[in-house]
Amino acid sequence: METQLQSIFEDVVKTEVIEEAFAGMFMDSPEDEKTKLTSCLGAFRQFWSTLPQESHEQCVQWIVRFIHGQHSPKRIAFLYDCLAMAVETSLLPPRMVCQALISSDSLEWERTQLWALTFKLIRKIIGGVDYKGVRDLLKAVLDKIQTIPNFVSSAVVQQLLAAREVVEYILDRNACLLPAYFAVTEIRKLCPEGALSHWLLGSLISDFVDSFRPTARINSICGRCSLLPVVNNSGAICNSWKLDPTTLRFPLRGMLPYDKDLFDPQTGLLRYVLEQPYSRDMVCNMLGLNKQHKQRCPVLEDQLVDLVVYAMERSETEEQFDDGGTSQLLWQHLSSQLIFFVLFQFASFPHMVLSLHQKLAGRGLIKGRDHLMWVLLQFISGSIQKNALGDFLPVMKLFDLLYPEKECIPVPDINKPQSTHAFAMTCIWIHLNRKAQNDNSKLQIPIPHSLKLHHEFLQQSLRNKSLPMTDYKIALLCNAYSTNSECFTLPMGVLVETIYGNGSMRITLPGTNCMASGSVTPLPMNLLDSLTVHAKMSLIHSIATRVIKLAHAKSSLALAPALVETYSRLLVYMEIESLGIKGFISQLLPNVFKSHAWGILHTLLEMFSYRMHHIQPHYRVQLLSHLHSLAAVPQTNQNQLHLCVESTALRLITALGSSEVQPQFTRFLNDPKTVLSAESEELNRALILTLARATHVTDFFTGSDSIQGTWCKDILQTIMNFTPHNWASHTLSCFPAPLQAFFKQNNVPQESRFNLKKNVEEEYRKWKSMTNENDIITHFSMQGSPPLFLCLLWKMLLETDHINQIGFRVLERIGARALVAHVRTFADFLVYEFSTSAGGQQLNKCIEILNDMVWKYNIVTLDRLILCLAMRSHEGNEAQVCYFIIQLLLLKPNDFRNRVSDFVKENAPEHWLQSDWHTKHMTYHKKYPEKLYFEGLAEQVNPPIQLQSQYLPIYFGNVCLRFLPVFDIVIHRFLELLPVSKSLETLLDHLGGLYKFHDRPVTYLYNTLHYYERHLRDRTNLKRKLVHAIMSSLKDNRTPGWCLSETYLKCGMNAREDNVWIPDDTYYCKLIGRLVDTMAGKSPGPFPNCDWRFNEFPNPAAHALHVTCVELMALAVPGKDVGNALLNVVLKSQPLVPRENITAWMNAIGLVITALPEPYWIVLHDRIVSVISSAVLSSGSDWLGYPFQLLDFTACHQSYSEMHCSYVLALAHAVWHHSSIGQLSLIPKFLSEVLKPIVKTEFQLLYVYHLVGPFLQRFQQERTRCMLEIGVAFYEMLQAVDQHSNHLAYMDPICDFLYHIKYMFTGDSVKDQVERIICSLRPAMRLRLRFITHISKMEPAAVPVSNSSSVQQTSSASSPTAQSTAGAAIPLSVTQ
């Protein structure tokens, strides 16, 4: 091949000797040149046609090498002409030629003439290269230019500029050689933000990059760096807040020149989240940290250190370290965060201590030093035994800095809890010294002089064998010697003995035959708070081990109340999670169950029901799954345990947070059976109600009409297989539409009341006619016989006023589990009986019998009977009768009302502050004993039966507390049926006080007002009554101002129907301001301080958000008006809203409005419509200035030049940034049905792109279907604008944005829909978008191999400057 090529080309360039001698005087005529060219090409064409395809590239490379081997510029120019002609006549492919030229090693800037000629040739033929080839050539040309040094002779610059001309041509928007989007990507890879382009290219590159700033802005959320989340404990993944774990930057898509603040590390956001209690899961979520993979995260480490420094600064300004003050809460939280992140190796302890030393040096901050050492002691004492001593020695550097005293520090007052902090440094020294001794290390440090008195005090206390519980000496010793087993045994032994009780003392527990160890006073919280994590772990480990040991031993003596209460208190500490709640669920419960220690099992379930706070959702669902498997075991088929298992399961189900339901249940999609009950219809119904509420509140089903393909489908299908049932139409009408459709399709035939009546009569006849006692017992208790026995007992009492002994025996034989089915049938039977009773005397008789069955004979407990009644699916009149029975059961006799009023009067819900709970508990049970084994019936039969039921220990529960989750359900059922509103008000009047003991009263109100918004719209009185009943039950146990605003309490609570209170703008501003101040961490904050570990909400912002939403939903004002008033807080000029803080207010409005039902937030769509229809955007006349500048809210706001449309844009972004994906999924419909018909001008189109562009990334991650619909809508709007506009001024930014969508999001998924649209656009637009469709025939002729394509319409988008830095380099690898 090479020989043939050589002969072809050497022939052409061969010259005579005389020509060479007189080189400057000989000149070929143009005809000779042409002849030479033609003959050379002819010979080459013949050769090329015989050459196999695979040798083509090699051949072209040889030719380039041959040309570059020539020294005569004339020869080179001639050969280049040959190449150009070969390309023009389609003999050689231009891409191959260009690539061979640019990649030649001989192409060096020093050979200036070769350089100039080569780039002129490339410039001439590059028009024929396909767009991906042009991209590769651009990259190669830019790389070649980088080889030119910064200093060259000015004489050669002219020749070097040929390369610049090639780049200029490639970047020419009108030539359209490739999507400009490709070009900017290559440029930004080479010159990231802040890097200067090569001098040869000058402003060419920077101007081109600047032309992409509008595209970057279209994809940016206004004020994104100021938006903050509310941290919850749901475990839901939230894509809006993800950050890069190495740089803390937002994960921005595409190599666009975003504004500088978007490229900055988002330390403010991470710091804010870290400051919130219970935020560690969210931090892991944001940074993508996985507990399984130990990976150090330096940026997280820095923020933790900064937080400690901030806490030190706070301590300087606080007068005293008061109990429960903000400073104490902050230090408490810090130690919890530090332990978690260091334990899982996301942060390195020695690095953090050294960094702290560096940041505190020279600051003179020493007021908080004890608290800092307390935080460090937590980690040191727990991990020093497993790690090298060297890891902990940097603490001594910190000591030298913070404890400059030359004299001894005096011993603090050890009657105060903060004394444990004052001793922290001494404890650290003791642990370090102990480690050094054990390791025989030479690093032993003598006790610093300033700590001598502290050390002596501890040594002396150790020698004192009787330690009192009245001061903090025990805590001090535990903290100092937890790594020294000889010394630790004494103080820990005292704590343990206090709660275990000494072996001899016994006390009785509620019920018969139930005895427990005698210790009743738990360890107080401030003592537990004063123990280091290591000491707490030893204590909880000791308790758990003892419980397991007692379970194995099948001890008949129940656990001491003090032990149970102390164990519950220890489970609140997140820092001991592995031994705490994790051990409780995955080790203790299974062990106890395996040992068949039913008393201890009952105790653990009671603890979970009445004493646990902020348990992560996956643990709760794991327990629920345990309970369902427990329910199937024969041994749990006893009245008390069965009742406890069902009650606990009911609490777990109804307490699931709306944002917790989907993430938790999707974990069980492969086996939904494990989280569902195989036999309890009530529990499965409760789960469906929870599911309906959760999907409504999170707007999961918004915009869809079927559950097909969702995580709910298998769950619902399995429930219907286990416990087929129907729903009453008034309940069903509140379900989200897809759930309604499912139950209408899966309708279950109901047994008619006539049949039920007939069957009861039939069975009753048998009862009366059978004589053999054994036959009767066998027949009525047999498995599979109709569950009608309670109906028969009812008839016996109605006809004979008594039940005989056989009745009792049958009940015993039926067993707790099977009896539930009898209660269910009985509930239906009662409704039919009451419906047909003649009223008056007979009705009173019916009520009396029913009450006797509950309170006199103890046949069924009130909470179970009411739950069954509330969960039946009666319609119309029968539903009213059912609710009437519930009301009578609860209010008619005094039995239950007295129990409630006494319990509410005598007890307080703050169990963690009490030392005498057990005494009050016993007093109550003595007055109102629980009878769970038909005791009343046993006494009444003739002859009476002597029962010796063995009760399981009851430490916390009673009928009132068990009734609370049932009451939640009852209220909801009553709300659904309009005619029973008055009855509900009566119930709330008499029993509302119970909400004092509800563990989530505000959340319950929030869920209720949200879920029933449609039902309560016009029932403002009932709404107010509900809020009033629940809030006033809590007034004695909450600080004033903890929930509802003063204005609302004054005007909203006492409003009359004829004089409805309509709040003014000031009211809404103050309400939003309260949330803004809370999130800003203002001190003192708008809400009273509290211990968040025992609060309903995990942190102040979550509390503020929920109480704000409850108050707004409780107003007697339509949702639409409230929504508009909230938007007006920033859209109208409000004196209470500070200009400089406007994005924080928008953030708060976004949080509040998205947490409200649809009518409240959908008004934003109306505002957007009015802006898009406004003259400014629709007139089409040129604006003063440049639209991209006007839509840059932050810059305009700072320069006081913002307009209404930019305010609405920024607010819409804040709202949508906080929206759930369900709420966002209405955007495609909004675009296609509402905005598309209005958008006619370029400004309107750009406004819509700005509005929706930033959310495509979220749609891609969470609802791809919506992203594709939006992509198509964008093209349809462009088509309308193209048809309505004579001139398009911003074609380039529009096309850049559409390319961004293609390469970052949609790929070719919408190609078929948009091809048709692109074909219909004006030629200039078609030319620019031709690479999206790949339709060559629509190109306005192949781009000529000459100067520039002649496109008449130019794009005049010069761009304002703004700064930015390279985003995540996402390769353009979407299928093209």
Curated annotation (Swiss-Prot):
<keyword id="KW-0804">Transcription</keyword>
<comment type="similarity">
    <text>Belongs to the Mediator complex subunit 23 family.</text>
</comment>
<dbReference type="GO" id="GO:0016592">
    <property type="term" value="C:mediator complex"/>
</dbReference>
<dbReference type="GO" id="GO:0010628">
    <property type="term" value="P:positive regulation of gene expression"/>
</dbReference>
<comment type="function">
    <text>Component of the Mediator complex, a coactivator involved in the regulated transcription of nearly all RNA polymerase II-dependent genes. Mediator functions as a bridge to convey information from gene-specific regulatory proteins to the basal RNA polymerase II transcription machinery. Mediator is recruited to promoters by direct interactions with regulatory proteins and serves as a scaffold for the assembly of a functional preinitiation complex with RNA polymerase II and the general transcription factors.</text>
</comment>
<feature type="region of interest" description="Disordered">
    <location>
        <begin position="1346"/>
        <end position="1376"/>
    </location>
</feature>
<dbReference type="GO" id="GO:0043473">
    <property type="term" value="P:pigmentation"/>
</dbReference>
<dbReference type="Pfam" id="PF11573">
    <property type="entry name" value="Med23"/>
</dbReference>
<dbReference type="InterPro" id="IPR021629">
    <property type="entry name" value="Mediator_Med23"/>
</dbReference>
<keyword id="KW-0539">Nucleus</keyword>
<dbReference type="GO" id="GO:0005667">
    <property type="term" value="C:transcription regulator complex"/>
</dbReference>
<feature type="compositionally biased region" description="Low complexity">
    <location>
        <begin position="1346"/>
        <end position="1369"/>
    </location>
</feature>
<dbReference type="GO" id="GO:0072359">
    <property type="term" value="P:circulatory system development"/>
</dbReference>
<protein>
    <recommendedName>
        <fullName>Mediator of RNA polymerase II transcription subunit 23</fullName>
    </recommendedName>
</protein>
<keyword id="KW-0010">Activator</keyword>
<keyword id="KW-0805">Transcription regulation</keyword>
<dbReference type="GO" id="GO:0006357">
    <property type="term" value="P:regulation of transcription by RNA polymerase II"/>
</dbReference>
<comment type="subunit">
    <text>Component of the Mediator complex.</text>
</comment>
<dbReference type="GO" id="GO:0050768">
    <property type="term" value="P:negative regulation of neurogenesis"/>
</dbReference>
